[in-house]
């Protein structure tokens, strides 16, 4: 059977339990062999950079996923010495995995609405399938016309014909109901974060004196 690989990118500043729940549900829903968490380098679309360094964010993801064999960390965007664009990351992964591998890129509904502003966005469909994490109230008809056209042409609801790339699959995943901003504020105020973050990650944050 061809490999089934998911891609879950984010700043992960810090990585927390909502990220992990979403990654595991992503793997479950699509019967993936592996989900690669890809910490962003310097995000080109954000004015404010990450609070923790690239190396620290990478360390935290490694600690958070250590007990789950289906989750892996991918360092390519951290190691890239230039802005990291999704199309470049997926192109590299496709070259490494081969044409037959089933590649899934996880995207939120808000990001999907802005997809046409991404670099070479139409090429994404040649490289991967898109898994859309649906939020309550998400309405595909409200997408920009060019994105909605792709939705209509590519959206699938079952796996009667799994393909290596080119489809859009809406998924009802656990919401990211914890923001990293709120978590950083709790850490800065020395408020309890039990159940919100992996204990090994919390110990690392305290050793490194992050988010003070």
UniProtKB/Swiss-Prot annotation:
Organism per entry: Chromobacterium violaceum (strain ATCC 12472 / DSM 30191 / JCM 1249 / CCUG 213 / NBRC 12614 / NCIMB 9131 / NCTC 9757 / MK)
Pfam families tied to this protein: CTP_transf_like
Family: Belongs to the NadD family.
Extent of the signal sequence: none
TM annotation in the entry: none
Name of protein: Probable nicotinate-nucleotide adenylyltransferase
Annotated catalysed reactions: nicotinate beta-D-ribonucleotide + ATP + H(+) = deamido-NAD(+) + diphosphate
Summary of the function given for this chain in its UniProt record: Catalyzes the reversible adenylation of nicotinate mononucleotide (NaMN) to nicotinic acid adenine dinucleotide (NaAD).
